[in-house]
């Protein structure tokens, strides 16, 4: 199925690209999320009229993500307190939701879907590196320090 991309999609294309994707991917994800429209003559003409507006929106989103990445990096580290046993293992785990809440409490609004825990949930005390994907091509890193309550 031919679609016109209205947003940059990682591993697929840039704004305005006409790409061929599987029908289910287009119907169930791209079109309902507003990331693409079907490539009909009317939609192609409509898109060409709106191309500058969509490219400006994409550039603004990228700039906002880069600014948020700079804020996250400026934090340096975030401390999370959790109940732990004698051997340094946590009762439970620190998940993406916990990290997002801690960073938001520190002053930078982060959604849990933007948090990347490379080794899965944090289950031990100490320093852990956490990455954030704020945009398709904007990443930030932060040191999360887990201490016992």
From Swiss-Prot:
UniProt keywords, alphabetically: Ribonucleoprotein, Ribosomal protein, RNA-binding, rRNA-binding
GO molecular-function term, one example from the UniProt record: rRNA binding
Superkingdom as given in the UniProt entry: Bacteria
Descriptive protein name: Large ribosomal subunit protein bL9
GO cellular component: ribonucleoprotein complex; ribosome
Family listed: Belongs to the bacterial ribosomal protein bL9 family.
GO biological process assignments: translation
Function as written in the Swiss-Prot or TrEMBL entry: Binds to the 23S rRNA.
InterPro entries the UniProt entry points to: Ribosomal_bL9, Ribosomal_bL9/RNase_H1_N, Ribosomal_bL9_bac/chp, Ribosomal_bL9_C, Ribosomal_bL9_C_sf, Ribosomal_bL9_N, Ribosomal_bL9_N_sf
């Amino acid at each position: 199925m031919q679609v016109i991309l209205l947003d940059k999609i990682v591993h697929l294309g840039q704004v305005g690209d006409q790409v061929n994707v599987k029908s289910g991917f287009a119907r169930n994800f791209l079109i309902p999320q507003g990331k693409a429209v079907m490539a009909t003559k009317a939609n192609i003409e409509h898109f060409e009229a709106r191309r500058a507006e969509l490219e400006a929106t994409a550039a603004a989103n990228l700039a906002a993500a880069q600014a948020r990445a700079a804020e996250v990096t400026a934090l340096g580290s975030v401390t999370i307190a959790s109940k732990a046993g004698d051997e340094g293992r946590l009762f439970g785990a620190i998940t993406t939701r916990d990290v997002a809440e801690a960073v938001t409490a520190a002053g930078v609004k982060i959604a849990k879907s933007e948090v990347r825990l490379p080794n899965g949930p944090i289950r031990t005390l100490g320093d852990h590196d956490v990455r954030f994907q704020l945009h398709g091509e904007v990443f930030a890193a932060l040191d999360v320090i887990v201490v016992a309550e």
